[in-house]
């Protein structure tokens, strides 16, 4: 089943990418993309930014106003300051709640699309051979092992294929990581070698020699 082979491999690649990048990082990226779209939520964020700007403006004016010399103006700014602060806190709490629900929704979809399929597919297709081994090339115990748990003898089970894909993806990731570290190390060493060393001038060197002779 070529389509199932590719699906299992794709799922393992996706799981490894998520583990490498981080679920929180992916959620934050999707949240920013969603906020960039022309939705009601993006309008709420625009309102929050405007409230924040108004609040900071009133706060600066309040700090620059004396409560003794200009009490009436100070009291008016103080009321505006408290009102804007209350609105800003309510808006922030509402958006934080929306962000929490968004994270739960995305986490659920991601789990179903990755970990959920990792458990469901091997169970559902446990008896389906992924592909057949060449007849007589492998001993009995090897054929039994790769067909475990319920695939026909002489075939590769979905569990064995999934395990092989996981090992291959991890191996490729480690190789890429090692290559990146090696290249970065080579660049740093080349930069260090390219730094010019200040040469000692002839007069200074001769002065040092004369000083040594006098000693």
Curated annotation (Swiss-Prot):
GO terms for molecular function: protein-membrane adaptor activity. One of its GO terms (biological process) is retrograde vesicle-mediated transport, Golgi to endoplasmic reticulum. One of its GO terms (cellular component) is endoplasmic reticulum. It is a multi-pass membrane protein. Keywords: Coiled coil, Endoplasmic reticulum, Membrane, Transmembrane, Transmembrane helix, Transport. The keyword NADP does not apply. Residues 25-110, 173-215 are cytoplasmic. Residues 1-4, 132-155 are lumenal. It is found in: Endoplasmic reticulum membrane. Its main location: endoplasmic reticulum. The chain crosses the membrane at residues 5-24, 111-131, 156-172. Residues 72-104 form a coiled coil. It comes from the Eukaryota. Interacts with GET3. HAMAP family: Get1. Belongs to the WRB/GET1 family. Required for the post-translational delivery of tail-anchored (TA) proteins to the endoplasmic reticulum. Acts as a membrane receptor for soluble GET3, which recognizes and selectively binds the transmembrane domain of TA proteins in the cytosol. This is Protein GET1. It comes from Pyricularia oryzae (strain 70-15 / ATCC MYA-4617 / FGSC 8958) (Rice blast fungus). The lineage of its organism: Eukaryota, Fungi, Dikarya, Ascomycota, Pezizomycotina.
């Amino acid at each position: 089943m070529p389509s199932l082979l590719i699906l299992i491999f794709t799922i393992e690649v996706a799981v490894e990418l998520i583990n490498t990048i981080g679920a929180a990082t992916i959620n934050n990226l999707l949240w920013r993309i969603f906020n960039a779209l022309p939705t009601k939520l993006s309008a709420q964020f625009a309102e929050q930014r405007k409230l924040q700007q108004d609040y900071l403006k009133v706060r600066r004016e309040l700090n620059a106003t004396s409560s003794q010399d200009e009490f009436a103006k100070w009291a008016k700014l103080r009321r505006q300051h408290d009102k804007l602060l209350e609105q800003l806190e309510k808006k922030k709490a509402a958006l934080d709640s929306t962000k929490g629900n968004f994270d739960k929704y995305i986490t659920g979809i991601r789990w179903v699309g990755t970990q959920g399929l990792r458990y469901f597919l091997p169970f559902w297709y446990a008896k389906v051979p992924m592909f057949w081994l060449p007849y007589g090339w492998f001993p009995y115990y090897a054929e039994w092992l790769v067909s475990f748990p319920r695939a026909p003898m002489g075939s590769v089970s979905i569990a064995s294929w999934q395990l092989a894909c996981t090992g291959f993806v991890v191996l490729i990731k480690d190789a890429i990581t090692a290559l990146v570290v090696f290249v970065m190390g080579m660049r740093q060493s080349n930069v260090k070698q390219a730094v010019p060393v200040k040469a000692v001038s002839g007069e200074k060197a001769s002065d040092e020699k004369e000083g040594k002779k006098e000693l």
